[in-house]
From Swiss-Prot:
It catalyses: tRNA(Thr) + L-threonine + ATP = L-threonyl-tRNA(Thr) + AMP + diphosphate + H(+). Pfam families: HGTP_anticodon, TGS, tRNA-synt_2b, tRNA_SAD. Coiled coil: none annotated. Homodimer. This is Threonine--tRNA ligase. One of its GO terms (cellular component) is cytosol. Residues 1-61 form the TGS domain. Its main location: cytoplasm. Residues 242-533 are annotated as: Catalytic. It comes from Ralstonia pickettii (strain 12J).
């Protein structure tokens, strides 16, 4: 007998080996029809998979996140099937699932056009309606290489040839199309009903710029039409909020071909940057951090000691001087340990919290650069806490509480907490991992946080927490982190004198709240669609004169606001007031103050808030109180 345990704890027994589909059928016809795949003892499998032992089984449908991934993976194969039907000379390469969709890379003699995408999507629909069965086959590596070589698919043959000789190769067949894949896939193409091709882009074979350029077709696929419609609407809204577009329109920054992946901040953008930096600097001061500053360039021998020279060198910018090799720092942590090591540290000095607005450089591939979100030169609100093992929990609690306040001040109230635990390849004892993971978990609980475990996702030297914020469009951004690290202090010989008089290694907690300031500013721009809260706006008030006769009063109003610390400018141009109001509205200035005869004569100001809200006339002192309230409330 084969005993199958279902997620609700119930058991079903079968006289012999049984497929996932048969188990689903035994539960009910509705579930059998909805089944897309199964999870047997934690492993994702096809519905045709035969279970020949007592096992735990979950039937996967389109209501499960894994089910949607199966739909997307299968739709990527459907895309390749359609391309081969329409363009037999095209060669297929790889087609993975990505966030909200999938892509597939093709080699073809000419670029695919928008009209081609329309034709391919139409063919995909036709193939899906045929409801062809999707079947799995297993071949030896050499037989699989011969199969794809015989089909003229040199890229697939190359991939398979790189797989160990003794490893079996899984293939999936639907109609006339066969592809290499681990699976699982939907049982038939008729399960694929909601999809759309999005765009074509270039991609190097195997991600190496020395290889030939392929064509990458991106698509999206969903369980329900309304889910796809909501996603497409979100994309439309995201396009309107694109920080690259708004950065140009609002004159905040630009990226120049003379320095790819680094940011040229314009006066308005740099004002925004400084406001965030000064805010975070106050956060440092008020929470026991000492601000430090390390050099940009460090000798390669330091990076050899940390292990980065061997594992990360290709992502570092290297330079040479007087026969010594140096690297622009890609992270700040080694420098903070060198500062820590200056002078003997006692257990009484711990926890010791360093913070730095550290400029880092990483040699990211040019194809991965994206506005100010993904750059080569960036600055982090980088902090490191040197402490003992029994201090970790309290530090995590304090840091998490602080992070929540900071995110709230910036307008982010929905935060996801993810605790990454020990990977298979790791250093340290099981007991030390137990203690570190427990300290992180208890630190989160003490902060009132519900969190998700990410098994095996920790670094080789210690567990970490990722703090993921959700923006106005529901997108997730991982900005904050706290990481337990006993390894780097060991490598760089950091010590403190314990209560027992002996020397001990400190634990190092790597932590960041906003992470890269460049990326965080990009997130803020998109969160607010450029209409930043008053406290962050580069220009908080613009004073507009109606005619030249009001210029002197307008200037006096602007100067009064400036002296009180507000970012105010004055527009004295001889233009129609409606034109000036529209122009500054496009620039998303929080407040426009209009002054004419009435305002000048009565010593008042006519105030318009962003969004064309007329607040009427008021004394300047009343408007100042409104501004102060905005700044105090971070609005």
């Amino acid at each position: 007998m084969i005993a199958i345990t279902l997620p609700d704890g119930s058991r079903r027994e079968f006289p012999g080996p049984v497929t996932v589909a048969e188990v689903a059928q035994s539960i009910g016809a509705g579930l059998a029809k909805a089944a897309l795949a199964g999870r047997v003892d934690g492993q994702m499998v096809d519905t045709s998979y035969t279970i020949d032992h007592d096992a735990k089984l979950a039937i996967i449908t389109d209501k499960d996140a894994d089910g949607v991934d199966v739909i997307r993976h299968s739709t990527a194969h459907l895309l390749a099937y359609a391309v081969k039907e329409l363009y037999p000379d095209a060669q297929v390469t790889i087609g993975p699932v990505i966030e909200n969709g999938f892509y597939y890379d093709f080699a073809y003699k000419r670029p695919f056009t928008p009209d081609d995408l329309v034709a391919i999507e139409k063919k995909m629909g036709e193939l899906a309606k045929k409801d062809e069965k999707v079947t799995r086959e297993v071949l030896s590596r050499d037989d699989a290489v011969k199969l794809f070589q015989g089909m003229g698919e040199k890229y697939k043959a190359e991939i398979i040839a790189s797989i160990p000789e003794d490893q079996e190769i899984g293939l999936y067949r639907e109609g006339n199309f066969v592809d290499l894949c681990r699976g699982p896939h939907v049982p038939s193409t008729g399960k694929l009903k909601v999809f759309k091709l999005m765009k074509v882009a270039g991609a190097y074979w195997r991600g190496d710029h020395n290889n030939e350029m392929l064509q990458r077709i991106y698509g999206t696929a969903w369980a329900k039409r309304e889910d796809q419609d909501a996603y497409l609407h979100m994309l439309e809204e995201a396009e309107k909020r694109d920080h690259r577009k708004l950065g140009r329109e609002l004159d905040l920054f630009h990226i120049d071909e003379y320095s790819p992946g680094t940011v040229f901040w314009h006066p308005k953008g740099w004002t925004l940057w400084q406001e965030i930096e000064q805010y975070m600097r106050r956060v440092y001061r008020e929470n026991g951090y000492q601000e430090v500053k390390g050099p940009q360039i460090l000798d390669k021998t330091l990076w050899e000691k940390t292990g980065h020279w061997d594992k990360y060198r290709e992502n570092m910018f290297i330079t040479e001087s007087e026969k010594r090799e140096y690297a622009l720092k890609p992270m700040n942590c080694p420098g903070h340990i060198l500062i820590y090591k200056q002078g003997i540290k006692s257990y009484r000095d711990l926890p010791l919290r360093f913070g730095e607005f550290g400029a880092c450089h990483r040699n990211e591939p040019s194809g991965g650069l994206h506005g100010i979100m993904r750059v080569r030169g960036f600055t982090q609100d980088d902090g490191h806490i040197f402490c003992t093992e029994d201090m970790i929990q309290a530090e995590v609690t304090a840091f998490t509480t602080l992070l929540q306040k900071v995110y709230k001040d910036f307008g982010f109230t929905e935060i996801l907490y993810k605790l990454s635990t020990r990977p298979d390849k790791r250093i340290g004892t099981e007991e030390s991992w137990d203690r570190a993971e427990a300290a992180l978990a208890e630190g989160l609980r003490a902060s009132g946080c519900e969190f998700e475990y990410l098994p095996g996702e920790g670094a080789f030297y210690g567990p970490k927490i990722e703090y993921v914020l959700k923006d106005a469009l529901g997108r997730q951004w991982q900005c904050g982190t706290i990481q337990v690290d006993p390894n780097l202090p060991e490598r760089l010989d950091a010590e403190f004198v314990g209560e027992d008089g002996a020397r001990h290694r400190p634990i190092m907690l790597h932590r960041a709240i906003v992470g890269s300031l460049e990326r965080f500013i990009g997130i803020l721009i998109e969160q607010y669609a450029g209409a930043l809260p008053t406290w962050l706006s580069p220009v908080q008030v613009v004073v507009l004169s109606i005619t030249d006769s009001h210029a002197e009063y307008a200037q006096s109003v602007a100067q009064s606001l400036q002296k009180q610390g507000f970012r105010a400018v004055v527009d004295l141009r001889n233009e129609k007031i409606g034109y000036k109001i529209r122009e500054h509205s496009v620039q998303k200035v929080p407040y426009q103050v209009v002054v004419g005869d009435k305002e000048r004569d009565e010593n008042q100001v006519a105030v318009r808030a962003r969004g064309n809200v007329d607040l009427g006339s008021m004394p300047l002192s009343a408007f100042v109180e409104r501004l102060k309230n905005d700044l105090a409330n971070k609005s």
